[in-house]
Amino acid sequence: MVPSPALVGTPSVFPHHQSTSFFQETASFFNLDWERLWHSRSNSNSTSSPRNSPSQLSPPMAATAALRRSSDYGSADTECGEPCETGAPVSLNEVDLLAKMEQLNKSNEEDSRSVASKKTGSSESRKGAREHSPEEDEYFQEDLWSVWGELILNWEIEVKKRPNYIKDLVKRGIPQHFRMIAWQNLSNASVSSVHDLYSDYMRQSSVYEKVIQRDIPRTYPELDFFKDGERGQSLLFNVIKAYSVHDKEVGYCQGSAFIVGLLLLQMPEEEAFAVLVSLMENYRLRELYKPTMTDLGLCMFQLECLVQDQMPDLYTHFNNMGFDTSMYASSWFLTLFTTTMPLDIANRIMDCFLVEGMDFIFCISIAILQQARIELLRLDMEGMLKYFQREVRERYEFDADLLFTVANQVQLNAKRMKRLEKDYLTKRTKEQEEAVELRRLRTENRLLRQRIDYLEAESSALADRLVKGQVNLAQEAENYINIAHELNKLRDMNSDVHRKLEGAYETIRELSSARRDNIMDTGTQVDDTSMIEHIHSLQQELIEAHTRQADSENTLRDAKLRVSELEMANKRLLENEPSEDVAGLQEELISVKMREAESSLALKEMRQRLAELEQHWAKYVHVRAFDPSSASIEKESTSEAHSTQQQPSPPLTSARARLAKITASLIGGSTEETDNCISVRELEDQLMGVRIKEADTLAELKEMRQKVMELETQNHVCTNQLKRQDEEMKRVREDSEVLVKKRKELEDQLKDEKEKLDNKESEFNEGRINDRLKYSEAMQTIQDLQSSISQLELKKAEKWTQNQLRGSSVCDLDEESNSHGSICSNVDHLSLASDEMNALLADMTVRIPTLDDLAEEGSATETDELRPKELNDGNDTTDSGVQLSDSH
């Protein structure tokens, strides 16, 4: 892209409808002789001085001034070209171009966004007006503009020849009118091909449009250009939206809006978009604005390490206060100080950023912290936050040169920065791995907890089932025992009833025999009434006995049925094999009971052994109380017997010694052995106490072994439960897989049915559409027929009125009757056609009976109207005249 000659004295932000066409129109103008052109212009405007308005200086005159003052910049020997001819004529095209340049200069002065505007001057120009005299300021501006004008004209050559010189010039500050072209050239946006894509991006939609619209009012709210309703907000939205479409990975970040706004204050939106793309791709801003913001964390880490190296006391103060680097420096890197510094300082920072890149942001950050170190050491966290938000801006608003001077003195070690980058990446990788491992462990822990809860619930359910089963069995056994007791009672009652019945029968027989004997012996008659009463009472007793017998038989029968049912149920329970879980639990219960029985038996034996020992000890004590010698002998014998039991092969000498002691005690021995009797008894007592303690310890040992067996049994039971639960889980998983397969099959069937339904609906819709088309065609035909009928009726009425007025002859009437006949035949034909059409409409699926009825009624009324007219046509002229008069 060829630099435009209009950068000298042109507005910093061109109107959008003038910028593109004007640059294309004047692109070939750089090949002309600038000094010759300016000489002709100065001759034509001799009354105006070129020093009066710095905005109207031409690049050739600025280049000549730069050659005179080359000692100030140290490069005069390399900037001059061939001498220019000042007396050469100027063409009309060049004069037109100069006129356009003057017009644009005037529009620049009237533009509120331009730094050269008469309405809103920049803070730099106001400050310079206060510090310098107008002549010095004008001379300085003319000198600086001349250098930059020559530099912009020969940009491609100067960049290759003197890059360090350009870098120094940029650090001193780019003039406001040259920033648009200088930023494009420094960022290589002038040769980029993204200008052509901007219009395509504007026609596309972005997913970030709502977020962008929300954040636009927050961007530079103090500037009039970006207030509500102004053109700046629409331009800002367009550029940010275009970049979100251009780079879908980055999309939109709020910090980019301030950089775009800074660019829009200097150039049109297409050029701002090109510079933004270049900044994103070539100056690490794209990595800053990615959703992960990895590069932002790296910058924070590097800045923190730099502060630790250069200002350890401030670093310690920040750590003690819990003041993280991202709390004050994240906006510096995301917005390039556009939200922290005034606009003119932000422009100068952007100038140096385009030359040095992200390293200059580090330098500015270190410079701010160095100058504010003493004040920050006195503040707490809230004070430091307020300081970075307000006081930093106020401090450098009128003293920007100090900030840039200190920043230029800051030296960054490239190797140190690379090493910090490697350390940060290593640390981040380690943190990510630890986070992944932590998430995995948490997931495992959650799954294990779920499995433990599930197993505990299942084990509790199984235990409940086992307890319920045992309770049911106990209840059934108790019911069985109760029923057996009831059966025995009923049997006893039945036997008693049978005995009573037999006794009653025997009593009856005895009474009857006694009666016969009395009758035969005495011959006396018994009172009939008493006999009858006695018989009745006996009969009543007999009936009651029969009733009791029947009740007892019924009760016995019910008891037998209940017993048979219980026996069948018990037999069925014994024959049916229990389930695997119940069988396992029964086996485990049996093994536990067996172990418990063994342990209890061992415990009983141990207690019995202990009781025997205590009894033996009591006996020994009793005997010794009455006969010490015999007690000692018995004790020795018992001790020897125990020792022989515990030690099957004792030494021979000890056995002989004990035998000698026993014999000596029996025959009276020597006096020395009798003297030692007391000590022997004490030893025997101690030995017996030790044996009793040994028995106690053995008992405790067996109890501990019993507890160990119980714990092993519990462990075995838990292991079996876990195995069964794992098998149950496998079975449930298999069932779930089968259900998933069935679900997939059903879903496939559902999809097929939906497709069939869609096909049927499409066929039905096609049929409805065809029927509607047929119906519309039929209605159109009916309308055509009705219109033809109405036309024929009109013709008929016209002819009839003409004949009535003329008083036509009978021949005419005959002809007319013939014509009426033809009309009637046509009408009949039309009625036939309408009948066919009605039949067609009746066969259609779309039924509208009202229209068919109207058509039939219309045809009927038409035929009824035609018939009296035909009759009237057959009358003579007198009748027609009478009718005419009547009608009139």
Curated annotation (Swiss-Prot):
Changing R179K: Grinder formation defects are rescued in 4.1% of animals in an eat-17 ad707 mutant background. Residues 173-357 form the Rab-GAP TBC domain. Transmembrane segments: none annotated. One of its GO terms (biological process) is regulation of presynaptic dense core granule exocytosis. Gene3D superfamilies: putative rabgap domain of human tbc1 domain family member 14 like domains, Ypt/Rab-GAP domain of gyp1p, domain 1, Ypt/Rab-GAP domain of gyp1p, domain 3. Residues 41-60 have a biased composition (Low complexity). Residues 114-123, 874-888 have a biased composition (Polar residues). One of its GO terms (molecular function) is GTPase activator activity. Residues 41-87, 104-135, 631-654, 854-888 are annotated as: Disordered. The keyword 4Fe-4S does not apply. InterPro entries: Rab-GAP-TBC_dom, Rab-GAP_TBC_sf, Rab_GAP_TBC_domain. The keyword Coiled coil applies. Keywords: Coiled coil, GTPase activation. Residues 694-770 form a coiled coil. Residues 124-133 have a biased composition (Basic and acidic residues). GO terms for cellular component: cholinergic synapse; presynapse. Highly expressed in the terminal bulb muscles, pharyngeal muscle, in intestine and vulva. Rab GTPase activating protein for the small GTPase rab-6.2. Required for grinder formation, which is the feeding organ that breaks down food. May interact with rab-6.2 (in GTP-bound form). This is Rab GTPase-activating protein eat-17. It comes from Caenorhabditis elegans.
